[in-house]
Amino acid sequence: MKLPQGFRSASIAAGLKSTGALDLTLIENQGPEFKAAAVFTTNKVVAAPVVWSRQVAKGEIVRAVVLNSGGANACTGPQGFADTHMTAEHVGQLLGVSPGEVIVCSTGLIGELLPMSKIIAGLDSIAPVLDDMGLQTSAQAIMTTDSVPKIATAAFDGAEFAGIAKGAGMLAPALATMLSVIMTDAVVSDKAQEIFQRATDRTYNRIDSDGCTSTNDTVLFMASGASGVVVSDHDLEKILMTVCGSLAEQLIADAEGSTKTVAIKVLNASSEKDAVEVGRACARNNLLKAAIFGGDPNWGRVLAAVGTADANMDPLAIDVKLNGVQVCTNSSPDADKSSVNFEARLVEIEIDLKIGSASATIKIGRAHV
C-alpha cells in the first residue's frame, strides 16, 4: 500500500520477536515540509523512547520515525535511554538528518533492554531500500498481540492521508499501549499540534479495553506538504477525526479477549467534560461490564455507575436506553428489560442526563472482567 507523497518506509524482521515476524520499521519524511504533532501517554512511568520523543516533538519538526515491536525499552534505567539515543543517532547518520528530528517508538515487554545489535543491523538493512509502498508492512511491524494490522486512509482535494496503529490490550482513555503514525502530503498550518490534540482526545482517548494505560503510548502526525494542497484547519480536523476514528474503531474491534463492542453515549450533559466523565465511569465499572458480558440488561447498574462520576447531574432525572429500548425514565423503570437483546456483538447504552446540551461517546472493546 502506498504512502502519501514525500514519505518512504521499509520494514524488517530484525529478530526482536521470537516468531520471526516483522518487528522494525523506519518511516522518513522527505519534505519539503516537516511539520509534526504528537500526543504521548499520561502514565507517570514512561519508557525511554517517550522521554526522548517528547523532547523531539517540542520542535514540531520530525524527519523520521523508527518503531520497533518485541520490546518496550521501559523501566530500563540510564542504559535504556542511551539505547534510544543511539537509535536516533544511527537513523540520523543513515538518512543524513539531525537525531533531534527523529522520533523513536517501542512496544513490547517492559523491563528488558533491547538487543541493540539487532536494531542497528536491521536499520542498516532497511535504510537503503526505503520506498513509498511500505504502508502495509509498517503496520505489520508494530503489531504485538494484535491479530490484524490497522490501517486507515483518506483523500481530500488531491491530498492523501494514511495512518497505521497498533494496540490490542491495555486500551484505555488517555491512550492505550498504542502506537500510531498518521501521515499526509498536505500543506497544514502551524496549529497542527492543537488540532491533532483535539482529534486524539475525541477518538483514541475515548476507547477503553481494560482500564489500563501504558508506558509507551505515542501518536504521531507528520505532514510533508509534497502535494502542494493547502488544507484548512477546519478540514484538517475533520479528516484527522475520520482517520483517527477509523483506527480507534479497529483497535476496539481487536482488543484482547474482546467479545463485545459497547458504545456508551451520554447526552445532554452540562459540558463535554462531564459527558466524558460519565461515559468513562460506566466503561470502568466492573459490575456493569459483567452484566453486559452475561447478557443481562441491568439498567440499575448503569445508573449506579453514572452516580460515581464527578459530573453535574440530577440523580432523579436520568433516562437510559439499552439497544434502543427505553428501560429507565427519570431514574425509574420504564419498558421491561426483557425486551432488550444483548446477543449481537454491538451493545449500545444511551444515557440522557437532561441538564445541558453536550454529548460524548465512550467505546469499550472488552465487556468482561
Where are these regions (language model features)?
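A structural signal for small-residue-enriched, beta-sheet-centric alpha/beta enzyme cores
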Residues: 1-68, 72-83, 92-366
